[in-house]
Swiss-Prot record:
Protein name, entry field: Probable alpha-L-glutamate ligase
Classification via InterPro entries: ATP-grasp, ATP-grasp_RimK-type, ATP_grasp_subdomain_1, RimK, Rimk_N, Rp_bS6_RimK/Lys_biosynth_LsyX
Similarity field: Belongs to the RimK family.
One record GO biological process: protein modification process
GO cellular component: cytoplasm
Domain ATP-grasp: 112-294
PROSITE patterns reported in the protein's UniProt record: ATP_GRASP
Binding locations of Mg(2+) 1: D255, E267
Positions of Mn(2+) 2 binding: E267, N269
Any one GO molecular-function label of the UniProt entry: ribosomal S6-glutamic acid ligase activity
Species whose genome carries this gene: Histophilus somni (strain 2336)
Amino acid sequence: MKLLMLCREPRLYSCQRLKESAEDNGHQIDILDPNRCLLKLSKNAPHFELYYQVNSKSEPYLLPDYDAIIPRFGSTSTRMGCAVLRHFRTKNVFCLNDDVAFLKARDKWLSLQLLTEQGIAVPNSALSGAEFSATQAILQIQSPTILKTLHGSQGIGVILAENRKSAVSIMETLTQADVPLLMQDFIQEAQGTDIRCFVIGDKVVATMQRIGQEDEFRANFHRGGSAEKIQLTEQEKVLALKATKCLGLDVAGVDLIRSKQGLLVLEVNASPGLEMIEKTSGIDIALQMIVHIEKQFKR
């Protein structure tokens, strides 16, 4: 197969592992930055064209056809990355997470709404408009309060407000800067830990418990967190698969938390990192992703 990976940083661990696994299985793979693409629409055939420019001084060239697409772009490239995914979906090319599912997962509030609609428990959450009083809005959520920007990954854009006064101050400041925030209950009993479930297709292929640094409420690897192996219950496996299906994803990193209220889904990531979970679990997740693509291509 001829594969295309959409990625801004090809040297990242996840991109390199996927490249190695694809090539080891006999596939050709290109790694391209979606922000260097140009999409063209025309009333005359061909109606859809995709060009690529290696750098600002180079001559753009028309990209060839591909058999499958692997999206690995970050939140800052979501708009262009999803436009490229839609281009390929229009041409009936298999995308390992298409643009529709990707956009659902990348919008934190929308994803919480969709999960809740399907009866999947999430932390108590609230979203207020720019003209709604921050002082009144924050009363809907417990204190301490988690504040999150609607788009972001790797723990970036997540703030713990220790009291209502600081929460209101943060909300008012960021609202003035046109940065909307969602509010969530802080689950204190979790003590800075969560469970990452890596889902491919209809199977949870790997898991780990993530542990935040001392005095750090975020358990993300990129925030200095560590990880250890963990055994999932059958209920947790079912929940991770249900959350993945709810957003229409083929591949997902589902973050769960064990709370006094029961199991909660914190987030569903459409482009989950491989490094920490491969090293913790000892499972070759990159290979399983390539095998999943092969199975879809043979259908």
